[in-house]
Amino acid sequence: CHNKSVIKLTNSEVSLCEKHFNIYFEKKVRKTIRVYKMVAKQDAIGVAISGGKDSISLLYILNKIFKPSKIKLIAVAIDEGIKGYRDPNFAYVKKFCKKLKIQLKICSFKKEFGNTLDEITKKDKKTIPCTYCGVFRRKLLNEKAIELGATKLATGHNLDDEAQSILMNQLRKNIRASAILGPITGIKDDPSFVRRIKPFYFLTEKEVITFAYINNILDKYVECPNSILGYRRTIQETLNDLENKYPGTKHNIISSFLSVLPLLKKSFESAEIKKCKLCNAPTSKDICQACVLLER
């Protein structure tokens, strides 16, 4: 059409106006959900939400797609207890969920683990906050999803996020962690684990930001002050540099990974899913990583 372009698609020469980009975005999400059979008619979907562009956009588009059906959406937020970080973001999350008439559940590290993340890292100055945060967040999201009756847990991970995770696992020689990745996480179904789905798997970070902006759902998001300390930030910057020099790099990483993912998952299918001896959570070891960290 002749309307003003709002974005030039990555890995393509196509430029789209606001109207046609929204159509493109929704079609891509619907296709990803359909092709990977992410959602069934009887599902209730927990949506991990932080207030950032990815999770807000995810809740917005899933509400649009599933509102006509009987599929229930439940927003789940985690308050890690980082000074000056969550309060302003959660104020918007509450307002946004109320507007969409979606149930919101907020749980905290303080209530569930006895300490905020700030308190934990003061006691253990040798370990970066991201180590605790990632493990505890995953544990809580799974537990709360089960408590709320969710059969799937949707996360806002986009193509950039997945490419970063793939590269991180390769550099750390963590093959099992790679096998758990993909549009639907995990290796096999287990009643103690809610499978995670990634409807934004084939959408770039640039596309998600553009979607949030043109639909006026992007609030002033306070970034986590600890993010600059994490290994992921280094990988993110490296991949962005490669993408700038060699456009299509991130798409190629995803495409190559998906071609070997079925073999990766198959190689770990026979692995036993154990129960943590301390908290009964699903784990590949005798004691889950969350309990290992809590015992420090």
Language-model-derived ranges and their functions:
Residues 26, 34, 44, 152, ...:
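Flexible helical/loop "lid" subdomain adjacent to adenine-nucleotide binding pockets
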Residues 1-183, 202-215, 288:
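ATP-dependent adenylation/nucleotidyltransferase module used to activate substrates
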